[in-house]
Amino acid sequence: MGINASHVPETCYHHCNQTFESSRQCFKWCQELARKDEYKIYGYPYSTNTRRVLAVLHEKGLSYDPITVNLIAGDQKKPSFLAINPFGQVPVFLDGGLKLTESRAISEYIATVHKSRGTQLLNYKSYKTMGTQRMWMAIESFEFDPLTSTLTWEQSIKPMYGLKTDYKVVNETEAKLEKVLDIYEERLKNSSFLASNSFTMADLYHLPNIQYLMDTHTKRMFVNRPSVRRWVAEITARPAWKRACDVKAWYHKKKN
């Protein structure tokens, strides 16, 4: 007899498989966990941080209940949402009684709980592979994201709020991004992806801002570098990422 372990942490799943014959109570417990309510995510489908978490959920083939926090309407500043996250930011991720904020922390949690399911996003087979991946995840957070978030805000998000793009800021930020992308180009000449020759969380973290920037003048900075262009084309074409960007699916609560 098998069990549906889509939401059961691996430790529980393996333990109960081993003890099932002698422990009906353990098996019943695992069945109850497997049938528990799906994950809930408070977010906004246009939010880069929300999309980062959605990409992980889709890479793992997990279902979720999307709860809209309309950032343009200011829902994140309302007392009802601040009671959920006092920082007033999305996403907020609920797994039963566990509440998590910060998209990268949420992403690593999901990928760790479901490490044997779907795409292997955390390549921690050895200390060396772990170190390399963690390094590139940090590079994304501290070198790539601050610049590309500024460019995304100025060119893509501001217009949603009816605000004008500050092209002086754009030009200054692009000058800094040039140096970062030169380093990426050298890395990607010798590696299919950033952390290894397979797609990992280090690549996934880059997707939200890249997706927006591909529709701006900044696109040229990515396509003018052959190795970066190849990498961008490959990661943005992933089915899980396309689903993460499907705004209609969010509002229609389309699930896996």
UniProtKB/Swiss-Prot annotation:
Binding site for glutathione: 47-48, 76-77, 89-90, 102-103
Cellular compartment(s): Cytoplasm, Cytosol
Major location (coarse): cytoplasm
Matching InterPro entries: Glutathione-S-Trfase_C-like (IPR010987), Glutathione-S-Trfase_C_sf (IPR036282), Glutathione_S-Trfase (IPR040079), Glutathione_S-Trfase_N (IPR004045), GST_C (IPR004046), GST_Phi_C (IPR034347), Thioredoxin-like_sf (IPR036249)
Boundaries of every GST C-terminal domain copy: 126-256
Cysteine-cysteine disulfides: none
Domain GST N-terminal: 37-118
Reactions mediated catalytically: RX + glutathione = an S-substituted glutathione + a halide anion + H(+)
GO biological process, one term: toxin catabolic process
Gene3D superfamilies, per the entry: 1.20.1050.10, Glutaredoxin (3.40.30.10)
Classification via Pfam families: GST_C (PF00043), GST_N (PF02798)
Similarity annotation: Belongs to the GST superfamily. Phi family.
Function, as annotated: May be involved in the conjugation of reduced glutathione to a wide number of exogenous and endogenous hydrophobic electrophiles and have a detoxification role against certain herbicides.
PANTHER family, sorted: GLUTATHIONE S-TRANSFERASE F5, GLUTATHIONE S-TRANSFERASE RHO
Protein name: Glutathione S-transferase F5
Organism encoding this protein: Arabidopsis thaliana
Organism lineage: Eukaryota, Viridiplantae, Streptophyta, Embryophyta, Tracheophyta
Gene: GSTF5
